[in-house]
Amino acid sequence: MKKIKIFSLLLAGSLCFTACDDYLTETPKHSLTTDNAVLDYSGAKNAVNGIYGVYETGGSNLGGYLYSYLQCMAGFWTYSNEMYSMSYKQSSSATASQWSQLYDIINTCNAAINGINKLDDSSFPSVADKNSLLGEARCFRGYCNLELLWLYGHWFDKADSPYGIIYRDQTSELSNLMVGRSTVGESYQYILDDLEFAEQNAPDYTTAYRMNKLFAKAMHAKLLLVRGWEGDYAKALTLVNELLANNSGWQMETDLAKLYENGWNSKENCFSHYLGDNTDSYYGISGYEFMYSYGFYYSNKFTDLVQEWLDNDARHDVTFGTARAPETWDTSTKDNILTKLYHRGRYAGKNDMYATYPMRYAELYLMKAELLARTNPSDIQGALAPLNEMRAKYTNPVLEPVTGISTHQELMDAIFKEYVVALFMENETPWFASLRFEHDGKPWIYTLKPEVNFSENQYCWPIPDDEIHAHSNVIEQNPGLE
């Protein structure tokens, strides 16, 4: 990809402020540019709504594809040998689309943020309304930059590591594309600045269709949990406790079947990749979630230990079932398909609820259990309590409490197993857990795929080849992934 192609792709994001649905607003009546896009309050709202339009139609590899790849890396699934073996290199095509899609969304965020900031406060009903729009856009930008760091940066390094993100806070033009990599510490700070602003100013949670204060706080807590620097666990625990104490509409879906039936309409889903406007296309909604609507049928076996956990869990009959093949020509059916995400598949259910679950309410209880276990390791039952509190809330299926835990290692193994089973293929959390939790003195990932040789350098993907070669300035590739 040449420099001019990168420019055209990125600029396209800033020009295409299309509304997602009536729940957002009407489509803008004029062609938007970075100069005229935000002229008044209505334009500011359209600019923010435009972010969702780019995400909806241009984020097809940021849901099931992404989460499935990460869980192949963890050793849960062998669908992609490249991901399972961690053999990706700079020339790999498998990891390029997530990069471009995230930056397209970030570019649209920047157009909205910068346009709103240029408007005088008097253009808005109130300063709070202005900041609410900024909070929504900055939450989106912070979330996308966090995904970039987690995927393409040394998120696991110290602050002075040079392998952070390529941070962009301006709409992309030829004059500003040649940006170098930030340090890991700088990258985290950019992300936290956006998330913390959103925690204070973004809209309250009312629906998983929109960015909101609670999602910003939850992703802030998850960032700290994954990063694990000094003081991070204590701070994350405070944030999680605040979220659990919040009497908002975000809450557990006690009937687990309803969670997956309702998807982005579920009260347990804090934010989701809304796809409801795409029912009229050839493949309908399923066309934007290939892995969920197709991949799980033809590769429906998971690695031995994980398959055993899933098969023997009380949630199995709710999350697995019988389904038809996704191809027109293939009339076969299979048992033990991950129907919580596959649903009926691309053929029989092209417009089924192929939702994503970046942050479910249930995950807060698991985060709290882990954080208590790490900040107060001697209190085993105290750390186990949130996990069992979460399990006790379910009415379909009814889950028995986890018992027989007497050592810290047994506690950590139980929490890890719950992360995997409860959130399987739904988001990136089980992948990070496979690196963070230890078993037999080393991260769980080594137990899950002992035959694979890898190093910490392979905990992230390479920056795509096109990006490296498009820069006139030197962009350092992640070590070992050249």
Predicted segments, located by residue:
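Membrane-proximal, proline-rich intrinsically disordered regions
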Residues: 20-67, 296, 309-310, 398-399, ...
